[in-house]
Design a protein with these regions (language model features):
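Flexible loop/turn segments at secondary-structure boundaries
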Residues: 31-33, 59-65, 137-143, 194, ...
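Active-site neighborhood of glycoside hydrolase catalytic domains
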Residues: 143-257, 264-277
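A cross-domain feature marking catalytic cores of carbohydrate-active enzymes
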Residues: 25-27, 56-58, 132-136, 197-199, ...
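Flexible, acidic glycine-rich loops studded with aromatic residues
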Residues: 241-258, 263-387
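Structural preference for beta-strand elements that scaffold enzyme active sites
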Residues: 20-24, 51-53, 127-131, 166, ...
Length: 387
């Protein structure tokens, strides 16, 4: 990327309003090669983001090696993209059906230990720390597809996009989970590791008589079994956890040292985080999910709407920062990724640094337009006029 002085945030001689200025990048659903990750980090650094939340595991992809579990990447790293028309409602205008044309390799691959260490160092040189996410106990479908005994024993023959996506409370699953977090701690120096904690369907656990007879009498208790073991592993390495706000279903008061990401829509995530007593990050799905395109003919209108909503939302006790979110279920190529991120990521940068002292929109909009002119010359950016 050509070096020019960034216009946003508008005054970085002031201290930042948010200590956590993050972007979630989803490499589980679409595998982003190392050069794409480098370019993302370069863009983040330009606008003073300091946390890359790296979503590395989910139902449709497992992207990091775990010693002793070679099938994680051999099988879990090569799950075909789900052929479903629901993508069409999520894609940018004019990209209907684009998932059908996406190259097969977009869901194939994993990051070697050397790749990860390189990107950690690349990020650190730009004042960014990488916070990896290993999703437990739900959103584990890729791991279960590779090792079916980790999931529900009644669903061992389910397809990878089927319902067997939650770790089963067994010695094998707990050992696997520990191995994954031990290895993550060896690769990522971040003091915080994200453990997932997204909403888990407790029904299969609670309806299993053998689990009930073993004394595992509620979904909340079983989820705590997984989370407590993960935290014990992190604490062994001197780390602490971040988790989605859904963790409060099992822990109304989260374990000490845990940071929550308030993500559930309709203010549910915010309410859970605010009432938890834990420090929290605003990652509101209604405001900050940039992989949902703004449905408008004006390129700046979605950025304007986001800016108005965000500057009002960045208030609250124990609020430590803000995180934009880019899921990759329907974002399948680098040009489409940057199309979704920009220009809205620029207004997140301004609000994250300046908070209530952000420029008013009439002064901010020209700077956004100038930055976009620069970015379109230097990064892959989908042109809606030439789909």
């Amino acid at each position: 990327m050509a070096t020019t002085h960034p216009r946003l945030p508008h005054d970085t001689t002031r201290p930042p309003a948010c200590s956590w200025r993050g972007l979630l990048v989803d490499s589980a659903r679409t595998f982003w090669p190392v050069p794409t990750m480098e370019l993302l980090l370069t863009v983040m650094a330009r606008y003073r983001f300091n946390v890359l939340h790296w979503h590395l595991t989910d139902n449709t992809g497992w992207r990091m090696r775990v010693p002793g579990y070679p099938m994680l990447t051999a099988i879990g790293g090569n799950i075909p993209r789900q052929p479903s028309d629901w993508y069409d409602t999520e894609c940018a205008p004019g990209r209907k059906g684009s998932w059908r044309l996406t190259p097969a390799h977009s869901t194939q691959g994993f990051y070697s230990d050397a790749n990860i260490r390189h990107l950690v160092n690349f990020a650190a040189a730009r004042n960014i720390r990488i916070v990896p996410e290993i999703s437990i106990p739900s959103h584990a479908g890729a791991a279960i597809h590779a090792y079916p005994h980790l999931g529900n024993p009644a669903l061992v023959n389910e397809a990878p996009h089927g319902g067997n996506q939650t770790l089963w409370p067994s010695a094998a699953s707990l050992s696997f989970m520990e191995a994954a977090f031990h290895h993550a701690c060896s690769l990522f120096p971040s003091p915080t590791i994200h453990i997932g904690g997204a909403s888990t369907d407790w029904g299969p656990w609670e309806s299993d008589l053998s689990l009930m007879r073993a004394g595992l009498t509620s979904g909340a208790a079983i989820e705590r079994l997984f989370i407590d073991r993960a935290l014990r592993t992190l604490h062994f390495h001197g780390r602490r956890a971040a988790a989605w706000d859904s963790l409060t279903r099992a822990y109304p008061t989260p374990p000490p040292g845990t940071t929550l990401l308030a993500h559930r829509p309709g203010n549910a995530g915010r309410r859970a985080a605010e009432s938890s007593g834990a420090p929290w990050i605003l990652a509101d799905a209604d405001i900050l999910t940039l992989s949902h395109p703004g449905r408008t003919n004006s390129p700046l209108e979605p950025a304007h709407t986001l800016f108005d909503d965000l500057t009002q939302a960045l208030r609250g006790e124990r609020l430590k920062g803000v995180e934009a979110v880019a899921w990759s279920a329907s974002v399948t190529t680098p040009d489409l990724l940057f199309y979704h991120l920009l220009p809205r990521l620029l207004v997140v940068a301004e609000a994250a640094w300046h908070g209530e002292d952000s420029l008013p929109w009439d002064k901010l909009a020209p700077l956004v337009e100038q930055e976009m002119a620069h970015l379109r010359r230097t990064i892959p950016y989908w042109n809606p006029q030439r789909p």
